[in-house]
Amino acid sequence: MKSVTLRSVLSLALFFGTMPVLSAAPINDSKDAAKTPVAAGTAETEAAAAAAVQDDDPDKDVNRAQPDFTIVGLPTTLRLPKHKSAFRITHRFGRPLGEGDFSNLVEDFFGFDSGATIGFEYRYGLFKSTQVAVHRTNNRTIQFMVQREIKAQDESFPLSINVFGSAEGTNNFRDSYSPGLGVIVSHEFTDRAAVYAEPFWVNNTNPLPGELVDDNNSIMVGLGARLRLTAGLYGVFEVTPRVNGFDPGNHQMSFGIEKRAGGHSFQLNVSNAFGTTFGQMARGGTSDWYLGFNISRKFY
């Protein structure tokens, strides 16, 4: 009797031991699983990653060969991202560096104690590959400019080509209007250097009254280069020879050293003229040299 009972107990134990354990938690199907916190977090992460990919504009990447939108006064082919902006200050001191002896130059702190021609420029990316700018100097000249990329340098084409149009006027854009048209052609040598050739035409460059003017247009070919010396240090050079039309004085020429730090760029330059608009550059330079600087800031 005891053996029968023992066998019965063992049989029941084996029977219940082999039964599957039922979970009290409900089984989620695929739709329910997507609603769990872990799955929701994954979905949010994927959405953020997708948004980051969509916002990845190559125009926002640092261009080590062309870190700024100008050389000294001439424009470059650097693209400004859509709906982004940049700001630039130009400063040209009025004391000639060759005036007096060296001790006089030091006393005047290399021209920093003298008056200066100052300019402010705001640049905006209106569309992809299209930027607009307004530049005002402290002699109340205002220049408006629009620049459009036609072709970008790539493996199949060695040049970048931009076209631009400008209009400037004196007395806060009330008098002496000077429209201009030009082309910017550049070539980058890897990330070490960039060279430029910029033919452009400017009207109403002769400041004399119209009845005394035989030639009131200037055609120039701006030539420039930027060489990266170290990770963030550059040497810059440009010259703007007039090849036809009104061409008084000397061709405007500038050279300098430039330091880039993040979105900022500081350039110390030497030039034989004060001009920072196309009409001013068309009027040429002097036989003297002047110290100046540019400060620029990108807002992206």
Regions found by a protein language model. Name each.
Residues 1-10:
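Bacterial N-terminal signal peptides that target proteins for export
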Residues 220, 232, 236, 250-252, ...:
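Short amphipathic alpha-helical segments
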